[in-house]
């Protein structure tokens, strides 16, 4: 213990904590302890503010479909890096390995199979007891000439692009309601706003997904449940050609990591007033509408 010049004992720990405030030392150790406590609280607040800047979460749980590779895997890695427990699904076994790598889990399954969706949701709740975020990602539907695409292929596209989202949300929405909120991002395509002749099924059904995103967001906004869609342009998980690059005003393909960071923001508290939006991340390939 050391004296402060007025005969008042003050601990070296307090002196170190308050530094230049030594001239305010005083009459009792209680005042010193009070200042020390306030200094610690201020330091904790500064740490919290730094964390918020990086969209760090604590033990939130994100469910991600088609997460075995490409954008889905990049999103899983980004969310895991910002603090989420991840629950992954993909048709291949790659989501299983990635889930284990990221400290979560994965299953092999398809968004077109209701039993697989049930398994993913049920296992997530069994392991973690909650679901805070959903990323509805899928593969690509059949392509073909506009009138040559068969009814079966149109139905397959509907199953893959739109009904998968409906099915997931039927199961997760009651969980969100019980928890008091949740956030969803649907991965779509720029073709929802600018249809591409080589991919009519994707163009038409992703436009339908944009409408459904708005409908869902409006219906559940009052319950603190948000839904947005991200509409990527050409991303580096696709084969890159000079012809495609020439179409993109930004002069390059997008990166899966850029999509992942956009998704992480939309799921964060910082995007708490953003819902019902279809957000293009496309290097300006779609002209203003």
Show which residues each predicted segment covers.
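Active-site helix of classical SDR
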Residues: 169, 205-206, 213
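Substrate-binding pocket helix/loop in short-chain dehydrogenase/reductase
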Residues: 145-146, 150-158, 244
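Residue(s) in the substrate-gating loop at a strand-loop-helix junction
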Residues: 189
